[in-house]
Amino acid sequence: MSKQAFYKRLTTQQKKEIDHQKMIKMVKEYRKKVGSKTGGIKLHNELKQDFIDAGIKIGRDKFYSFLRLNKLLIPKTKNYITTTNSNHMYKKYKNLVKDKVPNRPEQLWVSDITYIKTENGHNYLALVTDAYSKQIMGYKLDNHMRTSLCLDALAMAIKNRKYPNRKLIHHSDRGFQYCNPKYTTFAQENGITMSMTEQYDPYENAIAERVNRTLKYEYGLKKTIKNTDLALKMTQQAVYIYNNLRTHFSLNLRKPADVHLNPNIKYKSYRKNNVNLPELTI
């Protein structure tokens, strides 16, 4: 090898190493800002313009190899188990949305409760999410699971409506909080129709459970948090990032807040074998 070729090769290798250090920094900064569990496809989609601006040319496959080489791939997480107390005497409503999909924002809301561990014991997070845009419309964190927890989350969601005159279905499991007449009456007084799961099928409330999982695994809510005040601050930050900064495959790598205001996408079901489900007609 000639001296000229040697130095050219050395310069190329040096540039590659510098580019890799730049990309490592970009990936870490993006994950710190948006979510520590952001995967490779989303990273490449969100950072490709930054790479171009930095003079870095890298396709998706090579980017995956780069992530693997630098131990930046996200390990797969195990499924978690949810429990619902449906052993009560309250009225249980029919499932109005089974095997149907929404075609606009504020046509279908899904609600669920998850727990957040703190050093002082469990806290509970009630969420109301728009099924079409995936935007979290309302939430409430507290140290109890009483009906008021879910009522406060629903009240926030109603306050945050962008299309208040549209007909809306509220879908949840059959937990006593959602079946409580205080909750159902409040929903119905605000023009909301109740719908509930019929049995434990993960697809019957898949969106709500997926949101729970995302918040816990991507934004640090899975770990034991010092106290309720810190848990609330972390939840507020997580919801903001989830709604405004995090891209979603089901939204064609757009963000929930954007889709909620600019609803021009076709809904994608989480059911892999049922991609052409009929649309809701409410």
Regions found by a protein language model. Give the residues of each.
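Hydrophobic "anchor" residues
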Residues: 133-136
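C-terminal domain-tail junction helix/linker
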Residues: 188-192, 214-282
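RNase H-like two-metal-ion nuclease catalytic core shared by retroviral integrases
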Residues: 84-86, 172-174, 180-184, 194-216, ...
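Two-metal-ion RNase H-like nuclease active-site motif
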Residues: 97, 107-116
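Short, flexible loop/turn motifs enriched in small residues
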Residues: 118-124
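Active-site beta-loop-alpha junctions of metal-dependent nucleic acid enzymes
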Residues: 121, 140-163
